[in-house]
């Protein structure tokens, strides 16, 4: 039985003060959650948020990291910096990173490997665009992303990581993936993992859905057998909304 995981990706939102207020408000609302609860603030908010969640059931993730240990990479953050802070998870390969910052499946793979070296659990994002969905190449695209992004890992590592399926065509387009579409596509992703690492690993890996998740959509989504949680964007910026999703 896979434990559900619901993570809030705050993206480029919240000052340090606002971030602390948000988690302070969130703590009592999610204290009885039956799933793993994760918040992913910006880098500058990480120390304050980590301090605020101490003693609670909320874990903290980063939104990205570099694949090198250190060096001349202006504006980047190394994995050991996150590890030293006490960060637990790291989002890798989010569609916005791929779209605006030229993230590729190869860099995703480098980051995933490096995350494990520093005791960070990767939340690896994958998903297809509207053109790809309408061109009926969703499976081909996802297979490519997973086969490259998760190559050359140990079975133990793959069991630990989290995959987030985010249909890019359902983000800010007015189009939404039905629960059936989400479940079916996540089921397909699981078959790709099975082909790479075996049935036992595929049965254990947790795969989230991340396409405009709201308090009103989560219950039906979580009722689907393949969906193991959610990567939540906008709705994670309000404690009440995020708590409603966590306590589905």
Curated annotation (Swiss-Prot):
<protein>
    <recommendedName>
        <fullName>Triosephosphate isomerase</fullName>
        <ecNumber>5.3.1.1</ecNumber>
    </recommendedName>
</protein>
<dbReference type="GO" id="GO:0019563">
    <property type="term" value="P:glycerol catabolic process"/>
</dbReference>
<comment type="pathway">
    <text>Carbohydrate degradation; glycolysis; D-glyceraldehyde 3-phosphate from glycerone phosphate: step 1/1.</text>
</comment>
<feature type="binding site">
    <location>
        <position position="172"/>
    </location>
    <ligand>
        <name>substrate</name>
    </ligand>
</feature>
<dbReference type="GO" id="GO:0004807">
    <property type="term" value="F:triose-phosphate isomerase activity"/>
</dbReference>
<dbReference type="GO" id="GO:0046166">
    <property type="term" value="P:glyceraldehyde-3-phosphate biosynthetic process"/>
</dbReference>
<feature type="active site" description="Proton acceptor">
    <location>
        <position position="166"/>
    </location>
</feature>
<keyword id="KW-0963">Cytoplasm</keyword>
<keyword id="KW-0324">Glycolysis</keyword>
<dbReference type="GO" id="GO:0006094">
    <property type="term" value="P:gluconeogenesis"/>
</dbReference>
<dbReference type="InterPro" id="IPR020861">
    <property type="entry name" value="Triosephosphate_isomerase_AS"/>
</dbReference>
<dbReference type="InterPro" id="IPR022896">
    <property type="entry name" value="TrioseP_Isoase_bac/euk"/>
</dbReference>
<dbReference type="GO" id="GO:0005829">
    <property type="term" value="C:cytosol"/>
</dbReference>
<comment type="similarity">
    <text>Belongs to the triosephosphate isomerase family.</text>
</comment>
<dbReference type="InterPro" id="IPR013785">
    <property type="entry name" value="Aldolase_TIM"/>
</dbReference>
<feature type="binding site">
    <location>
        <begin position="233"/>
        <end position="234"/>
    </location>
    <ligand>
        <name>substrate</name>
    </ligand>
</feature>
<dbReference type="InterPro" id="IPR000652">
    <property type="entry name" value="Triosephosphate_isomerase"/>
</dbReference>
<feature type="binding site">
    <location>
        <position position="212"/>
    </location>
    <ligand>
        <name>substrate</name>
    </ligand>
</feature>
<comment type="pathway">
    <text>Carbohydrate biosynthesis; gluconeogenesis.</text>
</comment>
<dbReference type="GO" id="GO:0006096">
    <property type="term" value="P:glycolytic process"/>
</dbReference>
<comment type="subunit">
    <text>Homodimer.</text>
</comment>
<feature type="binding site">
    <location>
        <begin position="9"/>
        <end position="11"/>
    </location>
    <ligand>
        <name>substrate</name>
    </ligand>
</feature>
<feature type="active site" description="Electrophile">
    <location>
        <position position="94"/>
    </location>
</feature>
<dbReference type="Pfam" id="PF00121">
    <property type="entry name" value="TIM"/>
</dbReference>
<comment type="function">
    <text>Involved in the gluconeogenesis. Catalyzes stereospecifically the conversion of dihydroxyacetone phosphate (DHAP) to D-glyceraldehyde-3-phosphate (G3P).</text>
</comment>
<keyword id="KW-0312">Gluconeogenesis</keyword>
<keyword id="KW-0413">Isomerase</keyword>
<dbReference type="InterPro" id="IPR035990">
    <property type="entry name" value="TIM_sf"/>
</dbReference>
């Amino acid at each position: 039985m896979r434990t559900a995981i619901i993570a809030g990706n705050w993206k480029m939102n919240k000052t340090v003060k606002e971030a602390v207020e948000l988690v302070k408000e969130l703590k009592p609302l999610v204290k009885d959650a039956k799933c793993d609860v994760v918040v992913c603030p910006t880098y500058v908010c990480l120390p304050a948020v980590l301090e605020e969640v101490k003693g609670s059931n909320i874990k903290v993730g980063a939104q990205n990291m570099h694949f090198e240990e250190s060096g001349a990479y202006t504006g980047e953050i190394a994995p050991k910096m996150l590890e030293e802070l006490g960060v637990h998870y790291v989002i890798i390969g989010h569609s916005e990173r791929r779209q605006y910052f030229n993230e590729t499946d190869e860099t995703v793979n480098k980051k995933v490997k490096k995350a494990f070296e520093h005791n960070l659990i990767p939340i690896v994002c994958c998903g297809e665009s509207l053109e790809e969905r309408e061109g009926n190449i969703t499976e081909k695209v996802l297979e490519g992303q997973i086969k490259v992004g998760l190559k050359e890992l140990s079975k133990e590592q793959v069991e630990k990581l989290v995959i987030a399926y985010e249909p890019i065509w359902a983000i800010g387009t007015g189009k939404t993936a039905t629960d059936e579409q989400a479940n079916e596509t996540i089921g397909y992703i699981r078959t790709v993992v099975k082909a790479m690492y075996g049935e036992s690993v595929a049965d254990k890996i947790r795969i989230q859905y991340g396409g405009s998740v709201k308090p009103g959509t989560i219950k039906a989504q979580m009722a689907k057998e393949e969906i193991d949680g959610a990567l939540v964007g906008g709705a994670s910026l309000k404690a009440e909304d995020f708590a409603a999703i966590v306590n589905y």
